[in-house]
């Protein structure tokens, strides 16, 4: 890589110029902007070529340049996955394309099995079939790398098995550090494949003990779970500060919080009443009161630094790793029945059609009339439970919600009502049940009030020309839409690529399906076709909600993005102290980091649920269970247990002695001799062969020995389609 010659602009300066230019920026425009001599223009040409090779820029028609945000032709990759088919996948170690998901590249190895998860390689990359492949140029010597695993003893030697179900290799242990067989340990890797060894640096206890599953995720994803001493001291101090006299007093209103029965914190509360403004006939007034976290957590404070490092709270079935110290998150900031609390109040004027006629924000003091569980609020409205606040608080909320719901139906947001799993534990942390979480009107009511407040927050800041940390959800990419079209064709469902894609486009597909058996998997495929939402100071709209401006405002106890929006509102409306905001590039970096922390939390929560599900199902190993196929690959298929969840592999080697054709577009395996078909969404009984609570992995077999194979099995992959389908059928 050539270094810029003296007099030439730096890469950063060129990127800044291209980004800020109001017209196409070619070599001539760049040279003129930086006043380059004829000799320096020669160096500029070489520099621009280097930047293109590095993936920093690309040339548009007419030789204008733009920031590419793509994969460099030569880059350092970190190995992140080795799938069941033996394919190795890596991701760029550095990725600076804001808002663009980090790509996964399939790595072509000279020696199969020579690379392991966590290794770093220098690789040459190229596009192939809509995806990326990488050719390893050399491996990079690793720094000290840690692995979480379980010790196993065999013939006097100790071996370490990783808790990561993607990392299937065992490592010989050179030093147990006093740990015993069966212990969950943190170890350091040494050496390189195939001679990697491990040295135990911390003993964590019994991996099968209640509450260990979340501990595994905390260690694996390096989630900060201990506050700095100065943070705890500061939290104790600010918790005692008075609320002040310059707050709007809302304590006489019957404001209520409606939350899950097991909620650990209470960010939000709501109130509604008919509007007596003659300019808003049959309209409503609503207040969404949100915990005033910005009053307690000031920019640059010790609490703020710890919160920013975490990005959000992480919720597990047995514990929460809070973004804020417990004295704030579970007590002083949390809105509680009968106690005075500081709030940032969003006052809405809602028309009879559910439109926002006006909005304003104030700092207030509230005293909740009640904390009510979703189930109790729903039962009270349905007449199944007598509640003293039914007529004074709940009924007006439901009536105002009818207007908000009408506006929501008119804008037609994406409506994918997919069930969530809920793990129920006893007091000792043992699993009582795993079941889909019930979805009530009470849930939808609170969602619509929160969405209305989030929209008001974004628009209020735009009106004040203040910085906004938007919640962005972009339109699905063409690549994902093509994959969805191919999938829908297998059910004879038309999907025109030439149409303008809106959320309603997908809703109509679901409506046409009706109550067909394959409806859940079609909804899952539509969900997979969507882009991942993220935080950014540049507004790209929220596709899924069908909204032009959207920001997260309603959960500052558990999301740093919401705290940023609170500070912006406090500053824009001159509501007192705590309104300082990051600016420019720092705001962009903050959006990127909290988006990454959000994804980290989601993965940790999902993996922990998988471990609990595997533990729950471990008592049913050997039994035949009803399943549904959730992903088809060239090495088998994945299935989930009805009513419980958890993805498990049905290896192709156990499907009998047939040759199987893998059709990527229809997501199915077809037996050449038997004509047996295994396709996405298919329901079938399978025997649960293995359930590993430590890794969360499940494995299935065909029932009644149907999988016994008299001859070698193999898969014949249908040609002409890119090999970019992975676990759960996702395109990367």
Where are these regions (language model features)?
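Short, surface-exposed secondary-structure boundary micro-motifs
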Residues: 126-127, 190, 630, 689-691
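Short beta-strand-to-coil "C-cap" segments at the C-terminal boundary of structured domains/repeats
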Residues: 204, 572, 701-708
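A short, compositionally biased micro-patch
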Residues: 60, 82, 154, 351, ...
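Intrinsically disordered, low-complexity linker and terminal regions at domain boundaries
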Residues: 119, 183, 651-698, 703, ...
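A generic structural motif
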Residues: 85, 131, 155, 195, ...
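Charge-lined substrate channels and their catalytic hotspots, especially those that engage the 3′ end
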Residues: 1-287, 294-339, 371, 378-379, ...
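Electropositive polyanion-binding surfaces
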Residues: 216-223, 230-656, 666, 696, ...
């Amino acid at each position: 890589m050539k270094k810029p010659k003296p007099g030439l602009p730096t890469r950063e300066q060129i990127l800044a110029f291209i980004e800020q230019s109001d017209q196409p920026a070619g070599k001539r425009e760049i040279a003129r902007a930086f006043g380059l001599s004829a000799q320096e223009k020669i160096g500029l040409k070489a520099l621009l070529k280097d930047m293109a090779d590095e993936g920093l820029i690309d040339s548009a028609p007419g030789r204008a340049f733009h920031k590419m945000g793509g994969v460099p032709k030569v880059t350092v990759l970190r190995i992140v996955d080795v799938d069941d088919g033996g394919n190795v996948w890596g991701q760029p170690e550095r990725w600076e394309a804001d808002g663009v998901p980090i790509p996964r590249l399939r790595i072509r190895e000279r020696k199969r099995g020579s690379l392991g998860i966590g290794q770093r390689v220098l690789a040459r990359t190229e596009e192939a079939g809509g995806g990326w492949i990488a050719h390893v140029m050399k491996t990079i010597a690793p720094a000290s790398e840690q692995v979480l695993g379980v010790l196993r003893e065999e013939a006097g030697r100790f071996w370490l098995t990783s808790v990561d179900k993607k990392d299937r290799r065992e490592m010989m242990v050179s030093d147990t550090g006093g740990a015993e067989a069966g212990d969950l340990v943190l170890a350091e890797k040494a050496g390189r494949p195939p001679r990697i060894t491990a040295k135990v640096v911390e003993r964590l206890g019994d991996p099968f003990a209640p509450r260990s599953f979340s501990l595994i995720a905390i260690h694996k994803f390096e989630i900060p779970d201990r506050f700095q001493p100065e943070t705890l001291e500061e939290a104790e101090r600010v918790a005692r500060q008075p609320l002040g006299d310059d707050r709007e007093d809302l304590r006489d209103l019957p404001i209520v919080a409606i939350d899950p029965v097991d909620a650990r914190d209470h960010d939000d509360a709501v109130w509604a009443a008919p509007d007596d403004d003659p300019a808003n006939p049959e309209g409503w007034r609503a207040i969404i009161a949100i915990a005033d976290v910005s009053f307690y957590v000031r920019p640059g404070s010790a609490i703020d630094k710890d919160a920013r490092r975490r990005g959000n709270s992480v919720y597990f079935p047995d514990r929460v790793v809070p973004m804020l110290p417990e004295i704030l998150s579970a007590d002083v900031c949390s809105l509680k029945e009968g106690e005075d609390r500081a709030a940032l109040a969003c006052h809405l004027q809602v028309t009879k059609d559910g439109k926002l006629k006006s909005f304003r924000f104030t700092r207030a003091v509230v005293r909740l009339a009640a904390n009510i569980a979703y189930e109790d609020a729903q039962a009270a409205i349905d007449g199944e439970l007598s509640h003293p606040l039914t007529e004074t608080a709940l009924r007006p909320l439901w009536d105002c919600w009818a207007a908000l719901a009408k506006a929501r139906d008119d804008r037609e947001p994406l409506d994918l009502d997919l069930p969530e799993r809920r793990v129920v534990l006893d007091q000792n942390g043992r699993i009582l049940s795993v079941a889909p979480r019930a979805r009530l009107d009470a849930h939808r009511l609170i969602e619509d009030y929160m969405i209305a407040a989030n929209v008001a927050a974004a628009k209020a800041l735009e009106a004040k020309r203040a910085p906004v940390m938007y919640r962005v959800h972009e339109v699905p990419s063409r690549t994902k839409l093509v994959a969805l079209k191919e999938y829908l064709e297998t059910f004879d469902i038309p999907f025109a690529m030439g149409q303008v894609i809106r959320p309603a486009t997908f809703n109509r597909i679901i409506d046409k399906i009706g109550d067909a058996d394959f409806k859940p998997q079609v909804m899952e495929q539509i969900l997979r076709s969507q882009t991942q939402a993220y935080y950014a100071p540049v507004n790209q709209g929220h596709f899924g909600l069908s909204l032009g401006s959207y920001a997260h405002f309603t959960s500052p106890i558990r999301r740093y993005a919401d705290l940023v929006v609170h500070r912006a509102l406090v500053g824009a409306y001159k509501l007192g102290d705590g309104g300082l905001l990051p600016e420019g590039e720092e705001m962009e970096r903050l959006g990127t980091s909290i988006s990454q922390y959000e994804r980290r939390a989601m993965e940790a929560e999902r993996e922990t649920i998988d471990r609990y599900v595997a533990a729950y199902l471990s008592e049913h190993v050997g039994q035949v269970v009803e399943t549904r196929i959730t992903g088809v690959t060239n090495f088998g298929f994945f299935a989930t247990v009805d009513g419980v969840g958890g993805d498990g592999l049905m290896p192709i080697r156990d499907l009998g002695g047939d040759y199987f054709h893998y059709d990527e577009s229809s997501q199915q395996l077809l037996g050449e001799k038997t004509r047996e078909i295994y396709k996405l969404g298919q329901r079938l009984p399978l025997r649960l062969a293995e359930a590993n609570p430590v890794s969360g992995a499940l494995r299935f077999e065909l029932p009644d020995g149907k999988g016994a194979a008299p001859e070698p099995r193999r898969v014949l992959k249908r040609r002409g389609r890119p090999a970019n389908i992975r676990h759960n059928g996702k395109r990367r």
